[in-house]
Amino acid sequence: MMELESETQELHLHVNGEPEGKFSTEERSHKYSWRLRVSLYVTLLLAGETIATLLGRLYYEKGGKSTWLETLVQLVGFPLTLPCYYYLKPEPSKTKTITKKTTSSFLTLSLVYIGLGLLVAGHCILYSFGLLYLPVSTFSLISASQLAFNAVFSYFLNSQKITPFILNSLVLLTISSTLLVIQHEPESPSSTSKSAAKSKYVIGYICAVGSSAGYSLVLSLTDYAFEKILKKYTFKAILDMATYPSMVATCVVVVGLFGSGGWKKLSTEMEEFQLGKSSYILINIGSTISWQACLIGSVGLIIEVSSLFSNVISTLCLPVVPVLAVVFFRDEMSGIKLVAMFLAIWGFVSYGYQHYVNDRKPEEDQELPQSKEEEEQKQVDTIHVQA
């Protein structure tokens, strides 16, 4: 009888003991912290991208003409992150394994930041031209193709598998973007004739697609840099990746702005801006802050999850921006645009479902061993009761 009581006590300690309870509490706390960080980065990315896109279109709509300035506001906000180096000192992220190898050399890191900075500059320039020549609703729909580009780049650079759901998403997004080419009577705010409007529409379309490809390549390369070169996943690493490439890209755009002589026209442009000087300044400041918030959110999601997930969240703006464009800019929502939007949303849902399936697999793998242990424990209890 005494042996039965002692065995029962041991069983109780094994199932409900402090070590196991403590472990599960720490695990729950870690998951909560991770979800909180991801939610913050998602909010920064969605709010920043939506506001920045609408402000960029407003700049062109009310008399702004400088694509160099519109490119510059996407990049010049990097000094806003500098105070974070001194006031924020969070612990390293535990969502990924940190290797014990030594930190990459200064030369290697410099090449990484310079290379990414040049790509970011090219992407931003194409973005500015695309937004200039296309209605914001059309531009937003074409930008959804970045998800397809990112899947391809991630396959080669980040060992991402192309599953049936992802393949379905690629096909739908490609068809969605292709449909927008066949719109007859493309709109252009500065067109003087149908032929001129058509040529500008084609240029805008090419620039929008090129911008989407460039953005996707930057995300995949950033993910690759963290995995293979930086090999550390701290908040400081996020700030570094958001700051240094932006610094390089800003230098490139500033050279372009002064080299092209575009800076000479900025004072006249400000004087003639339809909403006035104050609005001109506020729009550009708002764009700068919004783009920097978007950048921090994007890099943060790359570290916490993956470049693919960051791009998926970015495309969540898809149904929001075209609707807001119709409300604020009176963009025409044609039948082709509606079909393109439906296909793009379908592609996004397919992509998102694949990510959901991937997230569920680790949980199911953990549940299987636990269920086996429970069955064994029940058998032990039955034996003890029979004894």
Swiss-Prot record:
It is found in: Membrane. The keyword Cytoplasm does not apply. InterPro entries: PUP_plant. Residues 1-24, 362-387 are annotated as: Disordered. One of its GO terms (molecular function) is purine nucleobase transmembrane transporter activity. Residues 9-24, 370-381 have a biased composition (Basic and acidic residues). Belongs to the purine permeases (TC 2.A.7.14) family. PANTHER family: OS09G0467300 PROTEIN-RELATED, PURINE PERMEASE 6-RELATED. This is Probable purine permease 6. It comes from Arabidopsis thaliana (Mouse-ear cress). The gene is PUP6.
